[in-house]
Regions:
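Typically the conserved alpha-helix immediately C-terminal to a functionally engaged Cys/Sec
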Residues: 67-82
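Thiol-based oxidoreductase modules, predominantly thioredoxin-like and allied folds used
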Residues: 35-39, 79-98
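Positively charged n-region of N-terminal signal peptides that target proteins for export
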Residues: 1-4
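Boundary at the C-terminal end of the N-terminal hydrophobic targeting segment
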Residues: 21-27
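Short active-site neighborhood of thiol/selenol oxidoreductases, capturing the structured segment around
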Residues: 51-64
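Bacterial N-terminal signal peptides
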Residues: 9-20
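A short beta-strand-turn-helix
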Residues: 37-53
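Non-catalytic, surface beta->alpha helical segment in thiol-disulfide oxidoreductase systems
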Residues: 108-157
Length: 157
């Protein structure tokens, strides 16, 4: 009897572990911190001025499924390579409300990606090809953000 109870408990907790591993996590996504040199805001601004590099600024949250999906495009080898031409800054909107308000020409939706000059000035002409939510790049494929990065490099360098 005791053996059956132990086996049943082992099976129950084993299943809980399997279900836990199979459940998707929306804890902000994996933004490729190994391949991309993400910087905090103040340090990133200083680095951009010093190295005369444009800035790619991304706002996200930990609870946003679109942000989790968008984080995956930053694993693309072409995006990783292109990121080296920028100072990459990633900010959690919920933890940086004042900055999120400052960078919200068409709203505080997420994720939002902006391209700034090395001096930290937003160029409003550099945005995704859409009328609404202009700073929302396609979350499902890297082509959209790559096109944005290429345009930013041409205009801001």
């Amino acid at each position: 009897m005791r053996t059956r109870a132990l086996i049943a408990a082992g099976c129950f907790f084993g299943l809980l572990g399997i279900v836990g591993l199979a459940t998707p996590s929306f804890a902000g996504g994996d933004w490729n911190d190994v391949g991309i040199a993400w910087q905090p805001y103040d340090k990133g601004l200083a680095e951009a001025k010093e190295k005369k590099k444009p800035i790619c600024l991304v706002f996200y949250t930990d609870w946003c499924p679109h942000c989790t999906n968008y984080s995956k495009v930053f694993h693309d080898p072409k995006v990783v390579e292109q990121s080296k031409s920028f100072v990459m800054i990633r900010l959690n909107k919920d933890e940086n409300k004042e900055l999120s308000s400052q960078y919200a020409p068409d709203g505080q939706y997420i994720p939002r990606t902006y391209f700034l000059s090395s001096g930290g000035t937003l160029d409003p002409s550099l945005h995704a090809p859409r009328d609404k939510y202009q700073y929302f790049y396609d979350e499902s494929a890297p082509a959209s953000i790559l096109a944005g990065m290429e345009s930013a490099l041409k205009k801001l360098n």
